[in-house]
């Protein structure tokens, strides 16, 4: 009820608590007490006290990459575990969202996280892996889909999106083709158009310019 609920009545997915190095909590953890010990037990922390609520359209792998990118840039570089460990974790996450991940990456992420949490010199380093660890534990299936199926269920990771045109909805107006920067869309006026996936750069211009909602992603 706080803040009016989730926009457009979309489904709740997770809430990230404690700032950039805080953990992500799922629906079953929403009744957790907001105190240090209670949050520590479930892999989160009070931190800055900020809450980021995420709906069903959020990619949890990208969330982990986003926060790891932030903390990696904030690392002072004084200690090796934080400086190099967060860099390695970020590289792995970037591979996964790009569709180049391997199943062994998940074990490596957890091993790196454990090492950083136990050996980093300051609070930033010790808490930096929390967004990654918490999302792997709660949303491992999403990580596996990115790695094995090369699919982002939220449609957020552009490298994993496949753009298609629904022939039933397409009116053949050619707006998508005219606005495609790489000429990947062809067809005849008043007939369904098609997308050449070998040329498509997944910019999303076709979706933005289709007045009939005929372009979609998988």
Predicted feature residues:
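Short, well-ordered coil/turn residues that connect adjacent beta-strands
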Residues: 167-168, 178, 197-198
């Amino acid at each position: 009820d706080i803040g009016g609920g989730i926009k457009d009545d979309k489904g709740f997915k997770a809430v990230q608590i404690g700032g950039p190095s805080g953990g992500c909590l799922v629906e079953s953890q929403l009744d957790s007490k907001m105190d240090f010990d209670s949050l520590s037990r479930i892999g989160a922390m009070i931190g800055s006290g900020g809450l980021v609520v995420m709906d069903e359209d959020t990619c949890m792998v990208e969330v982990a990459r986003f926060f790891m990118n932030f903390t990696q840039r904030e690392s002072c570089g004084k200690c090796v575990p934080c400086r190099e460990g967060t860099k390695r974790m970020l590289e792995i996450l970037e591979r996964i969202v790009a569709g180049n991940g391997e199943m062994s990456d998940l074990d490596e992420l957890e091993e790196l996280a454990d090492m950083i949490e136990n050996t980093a010199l300051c609070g930033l380093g010790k808490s930096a892996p929390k967004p990654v660890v918490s999302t792997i534990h709660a949303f491992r299936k999403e990580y596996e889909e990115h790695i094995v199926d090369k699919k982002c269920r939220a449609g957020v990771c552009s490298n994993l999106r496949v753009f298609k045109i629904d022939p039933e909805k397409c009116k053949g107006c050619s707006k998508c083709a005219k606005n495609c920067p790489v000429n990947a869309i062809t067809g005849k006026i008043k007939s369904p158009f098609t997308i050449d996936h070998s040329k498509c750069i997944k910019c999303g211009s076709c979706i933005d310019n289709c007045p009939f909602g005929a372009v979609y992603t998988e």
